[in-house]
Amino acid sequence: MHRFRVLTLCAGLAAGSQVMLSAAKGNADKGKAVFETCAVCHNPDNVEKKMGPGLKGFFKKDKMSNGKKVTDANVKARIDEGGQGMPAYKDMLSDAEKDDLIAYLKTL
């Protein structure tokens, strides 16, 4: 019985720490500042197209304009690679800035 409790406790701690790590990734306030560059082409407060699609509710959508599912990894790849008129930002933004930007996009 003691072994079961220890294993259960360890599993719970491991799961909890994983959730905390993923929740801590990116800072939406910093991401809002990064978004200033994106706002030239994207509306943050509606879905109307500027040069690129409006991004309000972006993470609530099933798919991005390229047909891929809206996930952190796919959004980061889109930021890195660009496409459909969007420039690639792989070498222009740090990984931390991309994480911050993604955190901000989740608030829209």
What kind of region is each of these model predictions?
Residues 21, 65, 88-91:
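Short, flexible active-site loop motifs that bind/organize anionic cofactors or intermediates
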Residues 1-28, 78, 104-108:
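Post-cleavage N-terminal segment of exported redox proteins
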Residues 28-33, 43-77:
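Gly/Gly-Pro-rich "capping" loops immediately C-terminal to redox-active cysteine motifs
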Residues 49-60, 77-108:
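Axial heme c-ligation environment in periplasmic c-type cytochrome domains
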Residues 25, 69, 92-93:
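Short, conserved sequence motifs enriched in acidic/basic residues, glycine, and aromatics
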